[in-house]
Structure formats: C-alpha cells, structure tokens
Amino acid sequence: MRLLIQAIVLLWICSVQAQSFDQLIDAVEKGDTQKVAGYLQQGLDPNTTDAQGHTILMVASRLGRAELVSLLLSQRARPNRQTPAGDTALMLASLGGHLEVVRILVDSGADVDRKAGWTPLHYATFAGNPEVVRYLLDRGANKNAVAPNGYTPLMLAVRNGHVAAAKALLYDDPDVTRKGPAGETALALAQRGNNQELVDLLKRAGAAE
C-alpha cells in the first residue's frame, strides 16, 4: 500500500510540474515577464526542457524577448545548453535577427563559435540578418566556418540572395575562393541565382570565374 501511495504522489508531482512548465512556456511566448518571474520564484528550474529539448531560455531567445532572456540568465539559465539537434539559444536568436538578445547572450558567456557543426554565424547569414552578422564577426566568429552541409557563411548568404548579409561578411574579408560540396564557389552560386548585385559584389571582393 505504501508503494502505491508513493507512486500516486510521484505521478501527481510530475503532473503538477508538467502543467507549471507548460504555463511557464505560455508566459514566455506572451512576453509576460512578471508571470515568468513568479514561476521562477516558486522554484521552477529555468533549465527544464520541453519535449523537443528546448529550454525556456531558448524559447525566449527565439522570440526575441530580451527582458525575459536577462531574467532567465540571472536565474542561472545555462546559455550553452543544446537541443538534440545541436541548437543553442544564441543560434536561435541569430536566426531570428534579435540583435539585443544576441548581445545579452554573448555578454553572459554564450559561445560565439563551435569546433564543428552549425554556428550562430551560419544561422545569421542563412536568414539574412546583417546586423547580427557584423556583431558576431566583431566578437570573433569564424567567418570561414564550414557548416554540416558544406557551405560557409558567405555561401549561405549568397545562396539565399541576402545581399546585405553578404556585404557584412565581405567587410571582414572571408575566403571567396572556398568551394561547396558540389565544387561551387560563392560566385557560382550568385550566378546560378541570377543575382547580378551579388555577382558584382563578389567580383569586387576578388572572386574569379
């Protein structure tokens, strides 16, 4: 009987915690800083993850909730936690173009670079966020990092037609001769996309046919 009671109590506790976490995520999505602070004061762990492995900090970063990001970091949310897919809060903020959040995360110790895999700079160039690109480069991001798909940040910007992001990268003099998985350069990608502005930009940066 005692074991049965313990099991029932444990299930009840888990149910309450899950419900509280769902409510916390809802508050984060709505940008309700006061409600989020209340849940944290009640002892809810800011590093708890949802079914997809996203922490509360990741959700707030993806949505650009700068005030909430600062609050969560002050409550010991870990900025370098990764999802099963390898995403971090900084990567999600970079993808969304949330410069203020990116700055807060980096100032709190978020890793700008990684030894392997996707980086925040890859995400920023892929999405075409030039201000984030410049900031990450200024903070030491590897301008020539090769993503798992074989592309550099410059190639990602060019392939997606992001002129401003490509310009932001070219100010830092990346390697314009690098080749992608099929042997294509950034210039070849620009030509394939019929983007004359990018073609001219790359040629001025030293890219050759």
At which residue positions do the language-model features occur?
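Ankyrin repeat boundary/linker residues
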Residues: 50, 83, 114-116, 147, ...
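Conserved ankyrin/ankyrin-like repeat signature
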Residues: 35, 67-68, 100-101, 131-132, ...
